[in-house]
């Protein structure tokens, strides 16, 4: 029965194959001409790809390694290991490689379905003509299908084989059956292409010849970049399968179905390039795979031109889409840089990307979150494909008849669908075309990448894949989008042709209809400055360099929001997924990233076209409907693609369907780091005034795509810079943009990431999965200070249309550091509890993003996740005001607004969802209370939005956060605490990611700005320690203090905000005369990570502020002052100017002018480190209770500060009165100290006094010791002063507590309160190290008593003889050295009697010590301890030799002086005969050969008189002593350091005085004797224990 069934099944399969073949042949014949034309147009692409293979392969490999941080393990080996196993088909493969024509002929004639994978498939052009008969695309599909349906065995193996194909592992007959099964799953009938050969024969032929070989061969061929780039055998094989539509890798991996792989490649190219072939791409079932293959084989993928011809409307879109991709290519470097951060995220992405194209990695890089979603999408299609495969397998498992029947039905249905789709595409008009095109692109992307891969790569996936993936939209759309999808998916890099595709690379690069072949440029050759079309059909649109300044993760391109609104929501899901995949592929394949598309893509793009910008990029849709549609689209798209993207806030996270031909897909210049969320970002420019809160309605962004593209992406990138400052403040706060609502939408997706925000790139938005550096560091917003590389580019946001306008909110402000006042989009009402968590996730990224892109991103996310929220947000969005809180002056208003934002701030602050929820609850209320004035527009529901503005205003970063925290006080504090607790986890990952991203070597800086990576985590960690104190203080002080005075903020802002202010001033063109860098300077302080705790532990270290060594705890302890400083309490007037008491300078002043903050990026690394160290010391020494986060000045611009200064003139006067006049002179910045700050300072000091009174003494003691040791005397400090803890001013400036002498009652009270404890603890006496003066040397010489001198000599002689007889080496050398020093004493005594005898004694002693020096070398048998002691003795010997040599010179110095004078005269006058010169000589002047040969002649020279010669000899001797003295001394020093004997000699120096070249012989004697005694004691001590 089984055999009969099998035979019947085979028969049915053959019939089905025949039917399918006839159908397919008709379709193929119809499409053949089109494809052939396309092929002709794209053939150049193939050649180009082949030529560029090595270079592209190398580049892709490097990129992947760099991006993933993963070293590709023997990818080539893995790739070629399996592929290299060539069967007898080697000759054929070789022919294919060498001669495509021959290979093609062979395949066409002898095989049914391998045209692509078989060597013959190599030449698409050759194949194209032959395709009709073998069009066996059929080869792959028909072969596979035939095989699968033709042979029962194939069918039996089909299910497993299909899976095996996916696994890529599988060779031999098993793959063959899978091929068949794949085919069958595709649909047996799809095989019309095969030339009705006996299917069994064809299958056997393929199995025998091509089973392993075709795929393997292709994979092995150097021309298979994809293969080479990816390890097919490795764990990533699935990745390749998913991503590669042709998925030669996955299919090759399933060598069993070389046909499949070819089919898949063919299918994918046809879908991409052949989308025009509605039927071909539409062959969802096996027919699709077959047609896909057939079109691919028959028609090289139609160049974009051909594709456009087939589907003119769609084609136009693909062109633009490709154009975007081409632009993406431009940003590949950025992508690469960004890719570094996605190391963890990449794998999933890679799996999705790498299979299809190396471009996948590029795309994932361009938009991590986008790539994640795309990978998710790929994964989803893959599951679909898998489902199809499984279903098909099941069908195959079912009675063969039923299976065949079903397959036939499926094929017919697929054909019908394809035909319908094709007409639809052709007939599609306007929006429908756009939609379909979008779908085509998306479907093409999914189909091409996932769909194709699914369909052709997975067999049944072929049927279901195209149908399922592109399903209604689009097989046909896929064809029209084919240009784009082929360019995007398979030609992302151009490149990596699938194995089947390998030789028909042009398929992957369909050219736009209007494009000529010459227009395509190789990635290497592509000049982004010159307009052109890449092989993939991507158009290169030259953009200003500034556009690329942002590190941009390529964002997914969305179709017009309108189209989406029109009902493309469903399509959008698929489209977005597909597009994301495509874009990922494009980005990977095309060196240009979509960012490049910014300008040109926008041409002809309507506002909707702009709306097509990825949702993440679009800050806000101007219309709710559009927004809602997007939300639904992204949500439908399986919120996995758009939701996850939005939640990830990856630029490409949400992919709006590619704009239709009319809708130029605009990729905003948004940084890959920060994708602008659709939530309308407030485009608030700079906060108008530091003291005022400016609410500005967000206008729709200008449609000009260029601006928007530039600004959004770049801004996103630059936004991180603002974030860097913002991040300094509990970064999460402002990130708490009203992302709550936004978060709410994307919450499902984002919520999970929220926890993972620690992982910068991987996590969706927060992690930086959004591709935002800021997102990555958003979790540790303080860490990700500097993602705002491109923040300066405000114009981008302007370019955005209304929806862009929503985004606009942050971008312009973000672009300038200060400008980051993106109004929190009116997020969906705080009511959403889950959103808060998401918001926190968003917040993480947004805090990185500086709220602008981040808030925008989260808004977009939320909109995508929940259309309702999005709609609300959108409506609000329109109403959204950009609230810029000038944190400084905003005081009450800021507090109110920030309060509302405080909740979002809590979210943004990096608090977990719980914090966010709590914040939302509290801040929602506070918002209702505080926000009412602003509420009318949108704020009612979006308390977070205000918070967003709070966070967004970079100048207000800390101030805003401060306001929010003061208003929400306890909540903020709690959030900060939690934030600090959590940040250490996420911050580390984010920091590493940011570091890599911004590493100039990685191209992160991109000459777009300087990225200073600084870690504020230290402050946050300290905040944890101080949390309890702060929690108590903050509620009390917050109301009294301006929002920017929030203690936590004050601390973080002190460091980060001043940096931010710096960056902002540079970044904000409006505010600053300084030309803004292309991107803001990102300041990410990583240094504080590890040091904080260490520094905290080391409170002993004197705090160095402004270069002063004033210990922070110094106030607590009165230190004994060396050098005549008064130890007792000293009036303030007596304070040394070098250690003035410094009031806390104005926050703005510090931010602007503080040395540490001003242009830190330009400071030397050492200087920055020193400043940071000082700041950390101040922070650690500051009691936690006193730790106040200095609120950053609301405005970063200098003139705002000036204005503030004027306003504070009265306060300054008061401060001056409070401070000593000398201090004023010393500290100009104290003038900027605000009275309220001073008051707070006093209060803090008083509060700290109680706590510090007890600890003052302990801290003082260590400090005292350090001071005593320090070369600089500590400044005199009164006891009262000591009690008052010094207050840390903003970053660089530390204010010492006001002296007790200060007249101010407040100061007096502050001092007096702590005074009693200070008095109670008298300063402990400080041990003074006494160093001898050179002139204090002992002048007393031993008596000239001859008996004493003789005694020294006798001692020396005795020791010398004892040493000669000593058997022990150590004792011998010590005795010799003792004899030497006694000889030195004798010589020194003799010096008074006879200098000549003394000289002789020293000289003999030197000879003796040199003679015995060899004994200092330890014997090999000596133990380690003995060797060490011997080495020390040798060092002492070297010292003695050096001093003896110098002594010998000194004894002859007078003679040497005379000799030098005589010789100088001789050489000056030139007296002396010149040999062979002017004077006659006995030597013949001739230089004849004869005379020279005789040897009687000497070379020309001067005759030196004998006396001069003798003098020269003496001089040489004397000067050699000087030389030897210094050489021997240096040798001794080197030995000390080399042997780690510094401690030993340091101790000797302390006990006996340092030994120098000026030491007397008595000092030498004492020093050496002490050293020898110590060594003997050590030896005897070690010897006794052993005994």
From Swiss-Prot:
Keywords: Developmental protein, DNA-binding, Nucleus, Pair-rule protein, Phosphoprotein, Transcription, Transcription regulation
Residues bearing the modification Phosphothreonine: 311
Ranges for region Disordered: 1-20, 115-194, 296-539, 551-593, 606-880, 902-996, 1049-1073, 1130-1213, 1297-1317, 1477-1506
Principal cellular location given in the protein's record: nucleus
GO MF terms, alphabetically ordered: DNA binding; transcription coregulator activity
Subcellular location: Nucleus
Gene Ontology cellular component annotations, sorted alphabetically: nucleus; super elongation complex
Biased composition (Basic and acidic residues): 319-332, 973-990, 1135-1153, 1162-1184
Feature: compositional bias, Polar residues: 182-193, 513-525, 682-694, 813-823, 1061-1073
Modified positions (Phosphoserine) in chain numbering: 341, 343, 724-725, 775, 777, 1261
Biased composition (Basic residues): 707-717
DNA-binding region in chain numbering: 754-766
Compositionally biased intervals (Gly residues): 458-475
Pfam families in alphabetical order: AFF4_CHD
Its job: Has a role in transcriptional regulation. Acts in parallel with the Ras/MAPK and the PI3K/PKB pathways in the control of cell identity and cellular growth. Essential for regulation of the cytoskeleton and cell growth but not for cell proliferation or growth rate. Required specifically for the microtubule-based basal transport of lipid droplets. Plays a partially redundant function downstream of Raf in cell fate specification in the developing eye. Pair-rule protein that regulates embryonic cellularization, gastrulation and segmentation.
Sequence similarity: Belongs to the AF4 family.
Protein name: AF4/FMR2 family member lilli
Organism, as annotated: Drosophila ananassae (Fruit fly)
């Amino acid at each position: 029965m089984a055999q009969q069934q099998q035979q019947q099944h085979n028969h049915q399969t053959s019939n089905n194959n025949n039917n399918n073949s006839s159908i397919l042949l008709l379709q193929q014949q119809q499409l053949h001409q089109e494809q052939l034309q396309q092929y002709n147009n794209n053939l150049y692409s193939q050649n180009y790809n082949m030529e560029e293979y090595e270079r592209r392969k190398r580049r892709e490999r490097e990129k992947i390694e760099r991006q993933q941080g993963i070293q590709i393990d023997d990818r080539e080996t893995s790739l070629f290991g399996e592929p290299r196993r060539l069967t007898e088909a080697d000759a054929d493969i070789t022919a294919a490689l060498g001669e495509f024509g021959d290979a093609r002929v062979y395949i066409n004639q002898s095989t049914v379905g391998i045209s692509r994978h078989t060597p013959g498939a190599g030449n698409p052009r050759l194949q194209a003509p032959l395709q009709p008969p073998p069009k066996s695309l059929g080869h792959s599909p028909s072969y596979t299908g035939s095989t699968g349906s033709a042979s029962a065995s194939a069918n039996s193996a089909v299910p497993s084989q299909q899976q095996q194909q996916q696994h890529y592992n599988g060779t031999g007959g098993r793959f063959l059956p899978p091929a068949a099964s794949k085919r069958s799953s595709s649909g047996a009938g799809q095989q019309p292409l095969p030339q009705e050969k006996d299917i069994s024969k064809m299958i056997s032929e393929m199995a025998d010849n091509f089973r392993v070989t075709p795929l393997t061969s292709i994979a092995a061929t150097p021309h298979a970049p994809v293969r080479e780039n990816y390890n097919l055998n490795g764990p990533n094989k699935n990745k390749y399968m998913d991503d590669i539509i042709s998925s030669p890798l996955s299919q090759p991996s399933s060598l069993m179905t070389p046909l499949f792989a070819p089919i898949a490649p063919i299918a994918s190219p046809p879908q991409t390039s052949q989308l025009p072939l509605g039927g071909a791409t539409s062959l969802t079932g096996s027919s699709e795979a077959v047609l896909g293959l057939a079109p691919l084989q028959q028609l090289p993928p139609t160049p974009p031109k051909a594709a456009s011809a087939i589907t003119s409307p769609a084609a136009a879109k693909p062109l633009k889409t490709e154009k975007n991709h081409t632009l993406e290519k431009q940003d590949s470097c950025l992508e690469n840089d960004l890719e570094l951060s996605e190391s963890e995220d990449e794998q999933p992405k890679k799996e999705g990307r790498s299979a299809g194209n190396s471009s996948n990695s590029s795309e994932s890089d361009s938009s991590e979150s986008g790539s994640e979603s795309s990978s998710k999408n790929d994964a989803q299609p893959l599951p679909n494909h898998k489902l199809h495969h499984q279903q098909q397998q099941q069908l195959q498992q079912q009675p063969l008849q039923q299976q065949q029947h079903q397959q036939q039905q499926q094929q017919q249905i697929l054909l019908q669908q394809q035909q319908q789709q094709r007409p639809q595409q052709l007939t599609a008009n306007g929006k429908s075309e756009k939609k379909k095109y979008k779908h085509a692109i998306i479907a093409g992307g999914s189909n091409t990448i996932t769909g194709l891969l699914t369909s052709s790569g997975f067999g049944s996936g072929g049927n279901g894949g195209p149908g399922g993936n592109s399903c209604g939209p689009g097989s046909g759309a896929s064809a029209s989008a084919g240009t784009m999808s082929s360019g995007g998916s398979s030609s992302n890099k151009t490149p990596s042709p699938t194995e089947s595709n390998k030789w028909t690379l042009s398929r992957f690069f369909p050219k736009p209809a209007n494009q000529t072949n010459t227009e395509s440029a190789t990635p290497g050759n592509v000049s982004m400055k010159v307009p052109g079309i890449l092989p993939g059909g991507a158009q290169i649109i030259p953009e200003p360099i500034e556009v690329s300044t942002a590190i941009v993760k390529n964002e997914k391109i969305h179709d017009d929001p309108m189209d989406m609104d029109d009902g493309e929501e469903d399509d959008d899901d698929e489209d977005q997924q597909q597009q994301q995949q495509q874009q990922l592929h494009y980005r990977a394949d095309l060196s240009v990233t979509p960012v490049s598309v910014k300008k040109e893509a926008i041409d002809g793009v309507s506002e909707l076209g702009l709306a097509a910008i990825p949702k993440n990029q679009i800050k806000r849709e101007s219309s709710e409907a559009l927004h809602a549609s997007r939300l639904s689209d992204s949500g439908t798209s399986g919120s996995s693609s758009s939701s996850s993207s939005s939640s990830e806030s990856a630029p490409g996270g949400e992919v709006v369907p590619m704009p239709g031909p009319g809708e130029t897909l605009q990729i905003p210049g948004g940084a890959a780091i920060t994708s602008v969320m659709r939530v309308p970002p407030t485009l608030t420019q700079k906060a108008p005034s530091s003291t005022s809160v400016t609410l500005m309605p967000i206008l729709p962004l200008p449609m000009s795509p260029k601006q928007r593209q530039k600004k959004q992406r770049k801004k996103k990138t630059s936004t991180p810079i603002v974030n860097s400052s913002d991040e300094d403040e509990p970064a999460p706060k402002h990130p708490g943009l009203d992302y709550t609502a936004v978060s709410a939408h994307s919450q499902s997706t984002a919520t999970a990431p929220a926890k993972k925000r620690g992982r910068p790139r991987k996590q969706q938005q927060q992690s930086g999965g959004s591709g935002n550096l800021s997102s990555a560091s958003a979790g540790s917003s303080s860490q990700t200070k500097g993602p705002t590389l491109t923040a300066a580019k405000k114009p981008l946001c302007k370019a955005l249309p209304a929806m862009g306008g929503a985004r606009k909110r942050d971008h312009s402000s973000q672009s300038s550091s200060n400008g980051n006042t993106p109004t929190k989009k009116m997020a969906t009402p705080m009511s959403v509890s889950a959103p808060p968590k998401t918001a926190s996730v968003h917040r993480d990224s947004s805090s990185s993003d500086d709220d602008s892109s981040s808030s925008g991103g989260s808004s977009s996310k939320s909109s995508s996740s929940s259309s309702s929220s999005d709609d609300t947000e959108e409506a609000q969005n329109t109403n959204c005001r950009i609230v810029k809180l000038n944190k400084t002056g905003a005081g009450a208003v800021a507090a109110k607004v920030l309060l509302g934002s405080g909740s979002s701030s809590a979210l943004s602050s990096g608090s977990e969802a719980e914090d966010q929820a709590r914040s939302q609850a509290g801040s929602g209320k506070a918002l209702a209370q505080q926000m009412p004035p602003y509420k009318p527009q949108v704020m009612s529901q979006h308390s977070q939005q205000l918070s967003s503005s709070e966070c967004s205003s970079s100048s207000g970063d800390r101030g805003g956060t401060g306001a929010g925290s003061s208003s929400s006080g306890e909540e903020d504090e709690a959030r900060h605490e939690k934030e600090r607790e959590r940040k250490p986890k996420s911050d580390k990952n984010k920091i590493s990611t940011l570091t890599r991203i911004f590493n100039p070597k990685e191209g992160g800086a991109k000459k777009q700005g300087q990225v200073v990576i600084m870690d504020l985590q230290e402050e946050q960690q300290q905040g944890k320690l101080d949390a309890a104190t702060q929690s108590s203080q903050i509620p009390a002080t917050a109301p009294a203090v301006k929002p920017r005075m929030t203690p936590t903020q004050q601390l973080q802002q002190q460091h980060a905000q001043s940096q931010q202010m710096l960056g902002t001033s540079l970044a904000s063109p409006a505010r600053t005369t300084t030309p803004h860098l292309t991107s803001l300077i990102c300041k990410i302080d990583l240094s504080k990570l590890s040091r904080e705790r260490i520094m905290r532990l080391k409170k002993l270290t004197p705090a160095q502020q402004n270069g002063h060594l004033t210990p922070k705890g110094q106030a607590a302890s009165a230190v004994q002052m060396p050098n005549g400083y008064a130890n007792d309490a000293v009036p303030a007037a007596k304070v040394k100017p070098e250690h003035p008491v410094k009031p806390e300078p104005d926050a703005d002043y510090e931010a602007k002018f503080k040395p540490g903050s001003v242009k830190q990026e330009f400071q030397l690394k050492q200087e920055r480190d020193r400043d940071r160290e000082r700041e950390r010391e101040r922070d650690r020494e500051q009691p936690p209770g006193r730790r106040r986060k200095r609120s950053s000045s609301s405005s970063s611009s200098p003139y705002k500060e000036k204005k503030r200064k004027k306003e504070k003139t009265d306060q300054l006067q008061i401060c001056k009165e409070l401070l000593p006049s000398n201090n004023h002179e010393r500290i100009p910045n104290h003038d900027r100290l605000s009275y309220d700050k001073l008051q707070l300072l006093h209060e803090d000091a008083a509060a700290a006094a109680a706590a510090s009174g007890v600890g003052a003494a302990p801290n003082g003691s260590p400090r005292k010791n350090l001071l005593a040791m320090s070369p600089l005397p500590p400044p005199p400090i009164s006891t009262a002063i000591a009690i008052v803890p010094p207050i840390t001013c903003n970053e660089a400036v530390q204010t010492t507590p006001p002296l007790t002498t200060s007249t101010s009652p407040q100061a007096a009270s502050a001092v007096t309160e702590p005074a009693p404890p200070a008095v109670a603890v008298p300063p402990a006496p400080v041990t003074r190290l006494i160093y001898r003066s050179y002139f204090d040397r002992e002048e007393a010489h031993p008596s000239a008593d001859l008996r004493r001198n003789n005694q020294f000599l006798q001692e020396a002689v005795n020791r010398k003889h004892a040493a000669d007889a000593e058997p022990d080496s150590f004792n011998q050398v010590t005795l010799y050295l003792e004899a030497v020093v006694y000889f030195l004493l004798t010589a020194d005594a003799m010096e008074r009697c006879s200098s000549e005898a003394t000289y002789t004694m020293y000289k003999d002693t030197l000879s003796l010590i040199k003679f015995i020096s060899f004994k200092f070398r330890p014997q090999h048998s000596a133990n380690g301890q003995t060797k060490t002691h011997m080495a020390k003795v040798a060092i002492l010997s070297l010292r003695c030799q050096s001093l003896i040599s110098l002594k010998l010179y000194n004894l002859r110095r007078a003679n040497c002086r005379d000799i030098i004078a005589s010789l100088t005269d001789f050489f000056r006058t030139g007296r002396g005969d010149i040999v062979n010169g002017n004077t006659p000589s006995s030597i013949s002047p001739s230089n004849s050969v004869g005379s020279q040969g005789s040897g009687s002649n000497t070379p020309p020279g001067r005759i030196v008189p004998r006396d001069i010669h003798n003098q020269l000899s003496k001089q040489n001797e004397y000067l050699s002593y000087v030389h030897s003295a210094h050489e021997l001394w240096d040798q001794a020093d080197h030995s000390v350091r080399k042997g780690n004997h510094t401690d030993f000699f340091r101790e000797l120096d302390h006990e006996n005085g340092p030994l120098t070249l000026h030491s007397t012989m008595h000092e030498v004697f004492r020093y050496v004797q002490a050293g020898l005694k110590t060594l003997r004691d050590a030896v005897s001590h070690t010897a006794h224990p052993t005994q």
